[in-house]
From Swiss-Prot:
Binds 2 magnesium ions per tetramer. The gene is pheS. It comes from Shewanella baltica (strain OS185). Pfam families: Phe_tRNA-synt_N, tRNA-synt_2d. It catalyses: tRNA(Phe) + L-phenylalanine + ATP = L-phenylalanyl-tRNA(Phe) + AMP + diphosphate + H(+). GO terms for cellular component: cytoplasm. This is Phenylalanine--tRNA ligase alpha subunit. Tetramer of two alpha and two beta subunits.
């Protein structure tokens, strides 16, 4: 009997020390299994006298029940602890704010276009749109670009057929507007344009904003004043601006406009000039009565200069690490 008591006491201590369900199952097998210590004690009954067997059998059963009860209690306790730990880990604090949907930001090119539209809108310019698939008259002929001009070459222009192409500038919008509306006109035409070029500073598709003002007695001084004010407004600095003589088929005289960079070098930002009389004639406007000026700027180039971006292609790669800087 003393040995049985020691077995039970030992089992109860080990059960209390068990830290997981697997350890408890091992204890059950060690004490109550077919080869367990309690089972071995039952086998000893064969060597006892008939008078001793009932008392010994009762003692073994009591020992077995004591161990089984302790195992059950410990198993229930561990399961309860595990469940409590799981509930704590998965606890939801209903007082915490919900997950808000992250607000996106405007693409830097869109920001630039909106900035340009806002400035010229305050000067009375309206925004006009036109087709991106253009015919040769609106893209070339009406703009005084001759049949053999280099801009018409296959390596510069995406042609569908000899008469139809992806527009190479938004100037076609100006032609269409002058065909349907009479002076005075003040318009800008932002949009996508296409040229067969791709490198660090050129992409096959890019954005352009062109402006047109047609009225009586328009002169180059007005053009200079408007563009000078625009550049200072856009870059938010009192920039040095210069106008260099240049050549464009659709303007005469023509100029390119530079601003002084922070490195002390001049940076080209746009082209401009007085509308060529041939362009006015092509749309039925009398160049003896009306004059006008036009200007054109690459949106990506202005955006690169404003935000200090070195590679034009970054605007089209949709890398959120890059785009999130402009939120």
């Amino acid at each position: 009997m003393q040995q049985l008591t020691e077995i039970v006491e030992q089992a109860l201590v080990i059960i209390d020390q068990a830290s997981d369900l697997k350890a408890l199952d091992d204890i059950r097998v060690d004490y109550l299994g077919k080869k367990g210590k309690i089972t071995d004690m039952m086998k000893m009954m064969g060597s006892l006298s008939p008078e001793e067997k009932p008392a010994f059998g009762q003692a073994v059963n009591d020992a077995k029940q004591a161990i089984q009860q302790k195992l059950t209690e410990r198993i229930d306790g561990l399961k309860s602890s595990e469940l409590e730990a799981k509930l704590i880990a998965e606890k939801i604090d209903v007082t915490l704010p919900g997950r808000t949907q992250e607000i996106g930001g405007l693409h830097p090119v869109t920001r630039t276009i909106e900035r340009i539209e806002t400035f010229f809108g305050e000067l009375g310019f309206s925004v006009k749109q036109g087709p991106e698939i253009e015919d040769d008259f609106h893209n070339f002929d009406a703009l005084n670009i001759s049949e053999h001009h280099p801009a018409r070459a296959d390596h510069d222009t995406f042609y569908f057929n000899p008469k139809l192409m992806l527009r190479t500038q938004t100037s076609g919008v100006q032609i269409r507007t002058m065909e349907t509306e009479k002076p005075p006109l003040r318009i800008i035409s932002p949009g996508r344009v296409y040229r067969n070029d791709y490198d660090q500073t050129h992409t096959p598709m890019f954005h352009q904003v062109e402006g047109l003002l047609v009225d009586e007695h328009v002169n180059f001084a007005e053009l200079k004043g408007i563009l000078h004010d625009f550049l200072r407004n856009f870059f938010e600095e009192d920039l040095q601006v210069r106008f260099r003589p240049s050549y464009f088929p659709f303007t005469e005289p023509s100029a390119e406009v530079d601003v002084m960079g922070k490195n002390g070098k001049w940076l080209e930002v746009l082209g401009c000039g007085m509308v060529h009389p041939n362009v006015l004639r092509s749309v039925g406007i009398d160049p003896e009565k009306y004059s006008g000026f036009a200007f054109g700027m690459g949106v990506e180039r202005l955006t690169m200069l404003r935000y200090g971006v070195n590679d034009l292609r970054a605007f089209f790669e949709n890398d959120l690490r890059f785009l999130k800087q402009f939120k």
